[in-house]
Design a protein with these regions (language model features):
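Flexible, glycine/threonine- and acidic-rich loop/arm segments that mediate assembly and lattice contacts
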Residues: 1-181, 187-189, 195, 201-209, ...
Length: 302
């Protein structure tokens, strides 16, 4: 709490030193390619890919680009740092990268069951933990339908104007203090214990071909709660978002989304000799999860 010294005493010979924890996250280099031969590039299909263009390879190239973007997003969510590298394939210098779920499992608040399974009790217990971690007043809640329905039932069961939202002015600072903007973006909001929660569907956790099943929701994530606030550096005063995707760049060279084509005359690209046009995609990026102790990972019961 403090200290007291006798008159005429010397200065203390012990002192406190800041325990600074420096965290780093390796960048992930994500790549993809698509190839079309000269003959295929002149084939006409039945899909108008835009502007009256029916060349079928353009549709395939567009799909490849979208899959590349999806893969990059999955790496940012599901990535893990590598400790033991299998060197049998000649790869020795990949460190992996910490994805969002990995960061929350390691340093975030992790629920032991879906919120709302026990009514307001679950949410109240979480709010007490949020108080301990100095959490901001606004959160975005992205969840699977399974969790989303429980939250709807919890709010409905509590009774509007009684246990939930009562006496608390909902905060919409993340939406320029505009409730309609939140609604237009698909968010439904409720308040409890001084916190406002803006919830939305996490489509990735509902897609049955990706993470949309109960086993994933129990063992990995049924939802996340992201603080809608900036983290302030105490020395410089600079502000940075609680969740940020970074890309490498320097001197005008940017690796956020690199795209180039090589070919042996196909489609006018003459920097190769093979009778193909090859489309290349590359990105070097990482996810920064600041103040992970204020983020929430929602998991079900196995």
């Amino acid at each position: 709490i403090g200290n007291m010294f006798a008159q005429g005493s010397d200065q203390p010979d012990r002192f406190l030193e800041s325990n600074v924890v420096k965290r780093t996250n390796p960048y992930a280099i994500v790549k993809e390619s698509f190839e079309v031969s000269g003959s295929q590039a002149t084939n006409i299909g039945y899909i108008d890919v835009g502007g009256g263009d029916y060349r079928y390879y353009i549709k395939s190239e567009m799909d490849t680009r979208q899959r590349f973007m999806d893969k990059r997003e999955m790496v940012m969510l599901l990535g893990q740092k590598v400790t033991n590298i299998d060197t049998t394939n000649g790869i020795t210098d990949i460190d992996g990268t910490e994805g969002y779920f990995s960061a929350l499992e390691d340093r975030g608040m992790v629920t032991s069951d879906l919120l709302g399974s026990n009514g307001l009790t679950d949410l109240d217990a979480l709010i007490k933990e949020m108080d301990k971690n100095g959490c901001p007043a606004e959160y975005a809640v992205y969840s699977a339908t399974r969790q989303d329905l429980l939250l709807d039932d919890m709010v409905a069961g509590a009774g509007a104007g009684t246990n939930v939202t009562a006496g608390v002015a909902a905060s919409f600072g993340a939406f320029n203090n505009d409730r309609d903007m939140a609604l237009n973006l698909g968010f439904k909001s409720f308040s409890r214990g001084g916190y406002t929660f803006h919830k939305n569907s996490f489509k990735l956790l509902n897609d049955p071909t990706l993470l949309g099943n109960d086993d994933v929701h129990n063992r990995l994530a049924a939802g996340v709660m992201i603080p809608l606030a900036n983290v302030v550096d105490p020395r410089s005063g600079e502000r940075a978002p609680a969740l940020e995707m970074n890309f490498k760049s320097a001197g005008g060279y940017d690796r956020e989304m690199e795209h180039w084509v090589t070919g042996g005359g196909v489609l006018g690209f003459t920097n190769d000799t093979q009778d193909v046009a090859k489309f290349h995609y590359r990105s070097e990026c990482c996810l920064v999860t600041r103040s992970a102790n204020q983020h929430v990972l929602i998991q079900g019961t196995v």
